[in-house]
């Protein structure tokens, strides 16, 4: 059956700031306390979406979350009105305020893991929400992510949205950032590659930075998504690269159809994995980048592999890259050599995503890939699909509500909370989502 890959990109939230919350993500740590520009950040993301949509790649949007997230502060024992809580936490525990104000839901590669209908035992599209258990600020996301996905993928005859796994370290799940699908045509059955960093009975794990994804979680997600057991491979990421800042697999590898583009040091037992994929995937091609041409540290600094690999109508592929790749002499030299060689990657497109990149999120972090047949695509909430009208509406919306400068101190401003809620309220109408946010369900603006 004919199907296409639709990229659902996360909209950057109004509280986008640099707090260094993500240990193991070196860009996040390096840019801690810098001044951010939320309006520029959301517009950089929108420009990428629109440019790719105009080039014929189907695009859709996933909204940001409610931030600062007052219910989490109440769980932590802060009391009073919303404004009083903001004041208390800013004075007593500013780190918590930063955590509950994180705009990290914009990186929707961590929102869920997707199984196309061609791979599922029941013939439906499955999405399992990620629990993001390793980081407090990200573990807050799952309930609202689930509500948003249910508002986008409403038709239960076509889509199954599964709640996140239990919030325990044993089942740490980071979503599609640790998942690749390989195969031929999108509408044909493919091979799903789940990548993990640790497993309970295995002592091979990183020493410096945490391995966020467990094998146990990957196996559970594959079961929930009803992936045909004959079409699944579980592979361990090289713990040495996790210790060099590769906190998700999509920082060191990206796949599309029959191509796996990765660093030569991406996986533990990489040769075994490559041979396994060669056996399972017709026409499989591994493009392994040698350390002599691009080191792991340069790959992390430029987010070479946090790129999008997109299929064009003629069968060739486009590599969507952050500007940091173009700015790095060695990486850019390698890329120009790559597109000149005999392989499906024949073109590159560079985007300025510096606001997201400074927090450790490149083009691939910002998107969730969902393979859909024409019938399934018609069943998606049409209001989230990117087109000229939505692009114009979202830019006007961002101009109205987003600040062009934000510091950690600004997070305590009760006006920011009010602006955010008003913006999201308008967005839910614009995208026909219903009342997906807790503040809408309580009906209280002041707690």
Curated annotation (Swiss-Prot):
Pathway in which this enzyme or protein is active: Amino-acid degradation; L-arginine degradation via AST pathway; L-glutamate and succinate from L-arginine: step 2/5
EC number: 3.5.3.23
EC class (word): hydrolase
Catalytic machinery residues: 174, 248, 365
The species this protein was found in: Salmonella schwarzengrund (strain CVM19633)
Family membership noted in the UniProt record: Belongs to the succinylarginine dihydrolase family.
Function: Catalyzes the hydrolysis of N(2)-succinylarginine into N(2)-succinylornithine, ammonia and CO(2).
Name of the protein described by the UniProt record: N-succinylarginine dihydrolase
